[in-house]
Amino acid sequence: MAADQAFEGEHIVAPSSSPDDVLRVEHIAKSFGATTALRDVNLHLKKGEVLGLLGDNGAGKSTLIKILCGFQKPDGGSMWLKGEPFAPKSVDDARAHGIDTVFQDLALVDQLSVYHNLFLHRERVSKPIPFLSNRVMRREARKALDEIGINIPSIDVPAARLSGGQRQAIAVARTISGDADIVLLDEPLAAMGAKEGAMILDLIQRLREEGNVSIIMILHNYVHVFAACDRVSLIQDGVIAFDRPTAETSVDELTEIVVEEYRRARQAASIGNGAGATPKPDPGTRDPGAAAPGPAEA
């Protein structure tokens, strides 16, 4: 479908939510001083679904993730978790309700062993774990890693000795072992090589096939979206500009949509700043496997 056919008015109309949504947000807005990060975000997530969130740097992706996990509070809008109104007071509150997040910094303690890292933060949720011996923690850690297919040579080594992909896998395993129903992944493939990226994509694919955990993850590479996601949403200028099952779209269409949205935003900025405004580079000349550049994320 051509970009000019896909648009209705300013933005593509996202499909309506349904009663079986595990998470639903409506009209979420967030500003930082004079900077608007999110204008009017509407999003839904079904049980077992993997949603890929795309957008330029500065489009509002990370801000949305931080609101969903309770790290930041929205200025307006509503959220529902399993059909009930939901307004997390903190990251710990969101975790206690089954929403866990893997941020880019991962929050692993380099000096601690793999198995110790797997049990970090578990004591903060509504069901704290009792005191466990190292023997029990080793056994439970190995069981958790085996269940989701993560191959770590030794769970006794400090986290500092793990590769980037292994660290990311441990962080994801920790959220799953903590009984999370919804996992938010903030750029899980950032700065990874092909082998490490494949490890994380394989892990996400296995979780997707099991269908027990719903996932929202920020991605920049369109190929990764189609390899691991059931649905893709494009956030642009603080709103969801495109939302569609990956089976019903393609890399080419997604690229065309992104370029068209970028040109619309550039044209609007030029009108707002006057005819003398300096245009930004056209993303149409870039590799379609990566999103267009932009300012730093708010």
Residue ranges and their predicted role:
Residues 3-274, 297-298:
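Glycine-rich phosphate-binding loops of nucleotide-dependent enzymes
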Residues 286-298:
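Long, low-complexity, intrinsically disordered segments
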